[in-house]
């Protein structure tokens, strides 16, 4: 019997293209599914430089009549991940410096065309191309691939099932309705009962409306997005499709993120069996960031996008107070985002030389060494579908201080302040409610009180390092889902209500312009 085959349709996949956690998640899941016996491939754009990083390139098809002009589909192998890739080549659309944004940090004006072309390529594969197996499952990732289920439905391809995974509902791919003809979306689907939301064509809504099944990346986030507060205008549709929504938690690459063998750490590697060696990584981080060489200092790290979603506005208020109240506190920050927050954090570092350091930007080596050297990680967020960064921190013995939202409410164990210090012997981190500076500041204070109790702190570190968040665990629910979909007869068209959009939170209103969905670093 032939193996089940799935084709993941995505805008990015590590290591060929990555802007954030989406790229990590796609590759991590694809590798786990492949190990479990699913014939798994990845379809994505051939961005600048991608073809130089793959081997065994073979021509599959010339695709005429595509949004954005003629394109070529090639197959290749990525030697770093061991996965087969199918790359959509159209230099006019994809040969650019950035994946999604121009030099001014704005979404490319033709993002609707760029990612509609990707969806049309997936539909052509589903219809059948010589030299390429037709997949049983088309697995669309986030809004960039949101048109895939719609196009498969419109083409009447009943033998191919579609799944949409929502990584971040706040980023929806919303474009002027007038572009529908240009991107090949039939007018019958551009209605309030179809892909239209707020008078615009919405790629995420298209996926949610027409996918056979929907998944999202944590249990708590699945509950949240069915509420007006977190549903970003799509909660009525999500509630209508609740029976088709499966919360399947993400995983992390526990081989890549392993302090015992991390190539980014070199001689600084350590493990849960010899956590005392973490002190060497702490000393190295202090030296690299220009912090005072003090093993007794509590070293708090922050590594995320500097945006309102990630509560950078709260951090710039809470951290100065924390540094003032706690003379032994040190802070090391890496990240990039809104310039006003970058400036304020750089000013904070100038005010506290030797105790606070900020690196604007991001690179993998610094990120790994940040987790290795830190005692604790600050990860505030107004919404967080999953939350990879706190899991990386736990893996490296850095205790997370995080908002009680999304996936972090599922993955971080915190018995609560009312239970007393001894209850924290079973904890893996500290969670806080609210999005104000006092809320974050109180959580930092609480962490420092626990840090002053070595037995409790070491227990929290060990608990976090022992947690199993690898992709092999996350892959099994997808195996069950795919098996059920392939074996079961295809359902009839799922009715959806006429949507009366819920009021949008401010952060969501600013996110509906075709922006990418960059998850946490």
From Swiss-Prot:
Annotated keywords: Glycogen biosynthesis, Glycosyltransferase, Transferase
GO molecular function, one term: alpha-1,4-glucan glucosyltransferase (UDP-glucose donor) activity
Gene3D superfamilies according to UniProt: Glycogen Phosphorylase B (3.40.50.2000)
Record's keyword annotation contains NAD: no
Transmembrane domains' residue ranges: none
Source superkingdom: Bacteria
GO terms classed as biological process: glycogen biosynthetic process
EC number of the protein: 2.4.1.21
The protein's annotated pathway: Glycan biosynthesis; glycogen biosynthesis
InterPro entries in alphabetical order: Glyco_trans_1, GS/SS, Starch_synth_cat_dom
Record's catalysed reaction(s): [(1->4)-alpha-D-glucosyl](n) + ADP-alpha-D-glucose = [(1->4)-alpha-D-glucosyl](n+1) + ADP + H(+)
Family per record: Belongs to the glycosyltransferase 1 family. Bacterial/plant glycogen synthase subfamily.
PANTHER family: ALPHA AMYLASE DOMAIN-CONTAINING PROTEIN (PTHR45825:SF11), GRANULE-BOUND STARCH SYNTHASE 1, CHLOROPLASTIC/AMYLOPLASTIC (PTHR45825)
Function: Synthesizes alpha-1,4-glucan chains using ADP-glucose.
Name of the protein in question: Glycogen synthase
Source organism of the structure: Bordetella petrii (strain ATCC BAA-461 / DSM 12804 / CCUG 43448)
């Amino acid at each position: 019997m032939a193996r089940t085959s799935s084709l993941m349709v995505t805008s990015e996949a590590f290591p060929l293209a990555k802007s954030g956690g989406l790229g990590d998640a796609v590759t991590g899941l694809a590798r786990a599914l492949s190990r479990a016996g699913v014939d798994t491939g990845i379809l994505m754009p051939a961005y600048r430089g991608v073809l130089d990083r793959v081997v065994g390139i073979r021509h599959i098809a010339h695709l005429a009549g595509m949004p954005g002009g003629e394109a070529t589909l090639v197959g290749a192998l990525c030697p770093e991940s061991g996965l087969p890739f199918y790359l959509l080549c159209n230099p006019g659309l994809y040969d650019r410096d950035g994946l999604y944004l121009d030099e001014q940090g704005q979404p490319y004006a033709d993002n609707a065309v760029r990612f509609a072309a990707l969806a049309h390529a997936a539909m052509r594969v589903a219809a059948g191309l010589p030299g390429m197996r037709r997949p049983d499952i088309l697995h669309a990732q986030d809004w960039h691939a949101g048109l895939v289920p719609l196009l498969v439905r419109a083409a009447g391809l009943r033998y191919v099932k579609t799944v949409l995974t929502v990584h971040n509902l706040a980023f929806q791919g919303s474009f002027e309705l007038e572009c529908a003809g240009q991107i090949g979306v039939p007018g019958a689907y551009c209605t309030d009962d179809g892909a239209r939301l707020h008078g615009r064509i919405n790629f995420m809504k298209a996926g949610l409306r027409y996918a056979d099944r929907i998944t999202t990346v944590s249990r708590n986030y699945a509950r949240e997005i069915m509420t007006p507060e977190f549903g970003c205008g799509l909660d009525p549709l999500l509630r209508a499709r609740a029976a088709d929504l499966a919360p399947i938690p993400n995983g992390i690459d526990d081989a890549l993120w392993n302090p015992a063998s991390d190539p980014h750490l070199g001689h600084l590697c350590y493990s849960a069996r010899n956590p005392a060696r973490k002190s060497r990584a702490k000393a190295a981080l202090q030296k690299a960031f220009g912090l005072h060489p003090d093993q007794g200092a509590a070293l708090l790290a922050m590594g995320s996008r500097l945006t309102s979603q990630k509560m950078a506005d709260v951090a710039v208020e809470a951290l100065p107070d924390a540094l003032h109240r706690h003379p032994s506190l040190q802070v090391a920050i890496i990240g990039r985002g809104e310039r006003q927050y970058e400036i304020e954090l750089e000013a904070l570092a100038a005010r506290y030389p030797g105790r606070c350091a900020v690196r604007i930007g991001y690179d993998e080596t610094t990120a790994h060494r940040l987790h290795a050297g830190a005692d604790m990680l600050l990860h505030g967020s107004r919404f967080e579908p999953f939350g990879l960064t706190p899991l990386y921190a736990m893996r490296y013995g850095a205790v997370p201080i995080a908002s009680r939202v999304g996936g972090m409410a599922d993955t971080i164990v915190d018995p609560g302040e009312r239970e007393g210090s001894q209850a924290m012997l079973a904890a893996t981190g500290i969670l806080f409610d609210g999005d104000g500076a006092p809320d974050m500041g109180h959580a930092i204070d609480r962490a420092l009180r626990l840090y002053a109790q070595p037995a409790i702190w070491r227990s929290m570190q060990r608990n976090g390092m022992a947690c199993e968040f690898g992709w092999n665990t996350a892959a099994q629910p997808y195996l069950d889902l795919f098996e059920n979909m392939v074996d079961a007869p295809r359902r009839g068209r799922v009715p959806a209500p006429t949507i009366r959009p819920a009021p949008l939170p401010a952060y969501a209103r600013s996110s509906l312009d075709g922006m990418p969905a960059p998850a946490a670093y």
